[in-house]
């Protein structure tokens, strides 16, 4: 993996987030967990001169990875080529609490700064956690979203991370 400046990237964030699945990973090489996400945001927020480059990810309270993101100052968000869709599907449907799920995939964990990503990632953002909040029922104007996405009222936690380093394949 090669480190680049975030400003060198050129991609459609809507396509990347919505069409390509990503992994959110937190912890150390000795103790980490990862999960698949297909919802998220990229942009800039807080600060002068256009704001800080940020990533927003959403994690349900019952996800094992939440504990790792909560306990870590850093997390990674990584994007993969289409050929790894089966691996990402596995990581999104199995819990690291119950098994060493990464060993059931072809992905190879590697350390990046204060966190972990995988060798096969075509793009990895190393993010420093800036904000943690929770989506609430009261905040919804369109109540159909609750019916459609939260029948168990297990509203996502929102994590905003500042992109400190960017790595490409």
Locations of regions flagged by a protein language model:
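Basic, polyanion-binding surface patches
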Residues: 1-169
């Amino acid at each position: 993996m090669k480190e680049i400046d975030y400003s060198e990237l050129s991609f459609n964030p809507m396509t990347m987030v919505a069409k390509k699945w990503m992994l959110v990973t937190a912890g150390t090489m000795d103790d980490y967990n990862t999960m698949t996400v297909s919802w998220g945001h990229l942009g800039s927020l807080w600060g002068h001169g256009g704001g800080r480059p940020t990533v927003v990810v959403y994690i349900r309270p019952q996800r094992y990875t939440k504990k790792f993101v909560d306990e870590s100052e850093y997390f990674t968000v990584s994007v993969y080529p289409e050929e790894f869709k089966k691996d990402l599907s596995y990581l999104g449907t199995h819990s690291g609490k119950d098994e060493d799920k990464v060993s059931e995939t072809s992905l190879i964990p590697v350390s990046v700064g204060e966190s972990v990503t995988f060798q096969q990632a075509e793009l990895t953002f190393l993010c420093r956690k800036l904000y943690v909040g929770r989506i609430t029922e009261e905040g919804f104007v369109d109540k159909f979203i609750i019916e459609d996405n939260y029948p168990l009222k297990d509203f996502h936690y929102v994590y905003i991370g500042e992109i400190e380093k960017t790595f490409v394949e």
